[in-house]
Structure formats: structure tokens, C-alpha cells
Amino acid sequence: MKKMHGFTLIELMIVVAIIGVLASIALMQYQNFVVRSQVTRVLMEAGELRLAVEQCLNDGTTTVGNGANECDPRASGSNIISGASQNPEIVIAANTGVVQFPNPLTEETALTATFNNSAASIIHGKKLIWQRQKSGSWYCHSNAAEKFLPSGCKYDASL
């Protein structure tokens, strides 16, 4: 009698099933990673404007614009944020948006970033806000799911 070599059909099917389960777990983790990285990116893009807003407030130039005694925080365009440039003299690239802020700037200015359709579908339309307090400190809050937020940003369902 010859000795058999190789795998049986059932053994091969079990291996394929195990690989399928592992691949589905890895895909879910990757999708969560993509969303978290997009939220962190917008957190940083919006956060960059805090220094410019502080400078404007300290200089007493609270009206947004390019003229004398006006302030332009120079929000950069992002392909995962929606929102038109608030300075009519500045044109941003197509399919990009900028962080929104009030005009005039106040001691409690909010820098608001809204995720557009280029962001992961689970965060479309969600907001991330850097809120200034009268004391001069800033805090972050968002209505994106808490599991996607960095540790310094709090979930806020009211946004």
C-alpha cells in the first residue's frame, strides 16, 4: 500500500476559512485606523489656526480680512474638510475646504471643521471643533464616534 502525501480537501477548506476570518478582522482594524488617522489629521489642521487666532486677538484685530486692522488666520485647504474660504480674495483649490471661524473673532471663538464626502463614510458631515475659552485655553470636542477621537478630544453629541 502506498503512503498518501498532501492534504485532504477538508484540511484545505479549514485553512481557507481561517485565512478568511483573519483577513476580515484585519480589514475592520484597517478601516478603523483610516478613520482615526483622518480625525487626527483634521484635529491638527484646525489646531494650527489657534496660534493665528491668538495673535489676532492679542493685536486687537478681530475682523477677518486682508485690510488694515484686519486679521486673516490663513486657513489652509484640506481635501477632507468642507467649507468655503471666508476671505473672498483667497481662492482655494477645487475639492478642498477650510476650517470655519466667526467674523469677527471673539474671546470664545470656535474653529469648526466639518468632514466632507472624501473622508471615511462613517464621519461624513461630522464636526470637530477647537473651542477657545475666555481664559485663553482651548479644548477640542467632536460628534464623531468616541472610538475615533484622540485622547485630547471629547465626544459631544450636541454638535
From Swiss-Prot:
Q: Which Gene3D superfamilies match?
A: Glycoprotein, Type 4 Pilin
Biological process per Gene Ontology, one example term: cell adhesion
Q: Where in the cell is it found?
A: Fimbrium; Membrane
* Recorded topology in the membrane: Single-pass membrane protein
Query: Listed GO cellular component terms?
Result: membrane; type IV pilus
Per the UniProt entry, the propeptide covers: 1-6
Q: SUPFAM superfamilies, per this entry?
A: Pili subunits (SSF54523)
Q: Just give the chief location class.
A: other
- Mention any Pfam family matching this sequence: Pilin
| Statement: the UniProt record of this protein carries the keyword Lipid biosynthesis | no
Q: What are the transmembrane regions?
A: 7-29
Alphabetized, the UniProt keywords read: Disulfide bond, Fimbrium, Membrane, Methylation, Transmembrane, Transmembrane helix
Residues that the record marks as modified (N-methylphenylalanine) are 7
Q: What are the cysteine partners in each disulfide bond? A: 56-71, 140-153
Q: Does the keyword Membrane apply?
A: yes
Stated family: Belongs to the N-Me-Phe pilin family.
Assembly and partners are described as: The pili are polar flexible filaments of about 5.4 nanometers diameter and 2.5 micrometers average length; they consist of only a single polypeptide chain arranged in a helical configuration of five subunits per turn in the assembled pilus.
NCBIfam families in the cross-refs? IV_pilin_GFxxxE
Protein name (Swiss-Prot/TrEMBL): Probable minor fimbrial protein
Native species: Dichelobacter nodosus
